[in-house]
Structure formats: structure tokens, C-alpha cells
Amino acid sequence: MSKIKANSLTIEFDTFGEPEAKPLLLVMGLGGQMIAWDENFCQQLADAGHFVIRYDNRDVGLTTHFDDHGVPDFKELVVEFMTNGTVKVPYTLDDMAMDGISLLDELGIEQAHICGVSLGGMIVQAMAINHGDRILSMTSIMSTTGNPDLPPAHPKAIEALTSKRVDDPKHAMDRAVEVSKIIGSTGFERDEQRIRNKALESYNRAYNPDGVARQMAAVMAHGDRRPGLNQLKLPCLVIHGDIDPLVPVTGAHDTHQNVPGAELMIIEGMGHDMPKGAWSQIVKGIASLTNQTSATVPRDA
């Protein structure tokens, strides 16, 4: 793992595969550190012909935290939005999208394929909308468009993610297992020990719940991306589980309908996670998409 200065931040990142291969930038979801992209999954993508780049988003992991901005008061944000139609937040999804683009700049990569899950899917959508000339293809996994008319998350899923903060490693592991039972896949084997191990690794590496709150505020402030998605002219794959209780599958259908020419992959039995049993299908879908176009030669950093 390495650090690099980009977009006035210190960004922690990691790579898999050969630099000459197709560049593929992976963007994790709300509060998720880059290690949530399993190394074996990343290696499968590398073996499929990609130069895989995973990184910590701002405010999580080992990338710059925004602690001096405090913790958002979501009740105040709702009132502000209802009153003014906009909200003031520490940073926006557009800022988070620029982080990824700036990372590509510093790595000397002119164009890249991008793939994001959940919040990461929203971020890659913002990348494609704002920096279309830099994007070769977009894969949006278990994400949505910001359409306010779509069904909300299941109350139990929201409760699971907004429950009391963890205060020790054991609590972190136990909570991860409980959350997995509520929002995770039922059509695939659940590896409880793997969930515990990953939760412990994340807790010990960098536990920052205030950063998660600031990321959530960025989501609230971003609004509807459909007008921008309608203008995209790039290969796009939308992947979603049919039983996702946190971001309902209607978000996938809405994304598919609003990105011209997008492909849709609905995985039966998948919830709001990426179970190991679905990796091969996901990797195959991404590889098929990225084969539709090729990157320019990386420029000098």
C-alpha cells in the first residue's frame, strides 16, 4: 500500500496487476475502507486483464480525515433542505469524485475504467458526469441515481447501519455479523469468520465514524443525477442484487433506464454485499464491459 498527494489530500491506495493493463479504479461505499475490496477479488480482476487501483475515500481508512469540520446534524440538514432546497456540507460527492480523478492524474493515467459499490457507485456516476473524457467505462454496483421518487431503504437496514457506535474490536466484529444478517445475501454462503476478520482489520486500521457521517451528508446534498446520467456516452454496466434491502433493486433499474445503452445484471439472492460466490459473475461482467473499449497510453505523471 502507498500514499500519494492528490486533490490537496493524502490518499492511501494499492494496486494489482501490470501497469500496462487496462486501468480499473475501484471506489468503495459508505464508510468502507479500500480493504473492503477483497484482495482475491482484486486479483481476479487483475487476472482478467486489468491494472486494478483501490483507494481509501476521503474521511475513511488512511486517507485524509476532515475532523475539523465536526459531525453533521442531520435534523438540521433536513430542515435546511426543506427550507432552502440545498444544504451546506463539509464536502460533496463531486469533491469525492475529484479525489479519484486526481489520483489517476498523479498515477499518470489519462483514462480509466471505473467501478463503484453503493456510495462508490454514486461517486463513479459523478466522475462520469463531470469528467467524461477521462472515463472509458463505468460499472455501478448496488447503487442508485438520486431519484427522490424511488422506494427507500428498509427500516431495519437503516437501523442496522445507524446503530450505536462500536467501542472495542469484539463489538466491531459482532456488529458486522449482525449487519450482514440484515442487509447481506441470503442466496450465497455467508462466511461469518471472514466477516469478523475483515471487521477487525478495518477497526484496527482506522475506525472513524464521524467520517462516515460526513460522507452521508455528502449523499444528502447531491440530489438527482438522472439529468447528467442521461447525457453519458460510454459503456456502462449496472449490477445489483435482487434482495438488497438497503438500496432496493429499483435503483439499478432506474440507473439502467437513465444511462443510454447501459447493460443490466441482476444477481439472484444477492443483498447489499458482494458475496464470494458472486465474484466470478461480477468479474466476468466487468471484463466484458472493459473489453468494449481500450485506454490511451498512460501519460507521464
What kind of region is each of these model predictions?
Residues 153-227, 234, 254:
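Alpha/beta-hydrolase
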Residues 129, 138-167:
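Flexible "cap/lid" loop of the alpha/beta hydrolase fold
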Residues 121-132, 138:
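Short glycine-enriched nucleophile-adjacent loop
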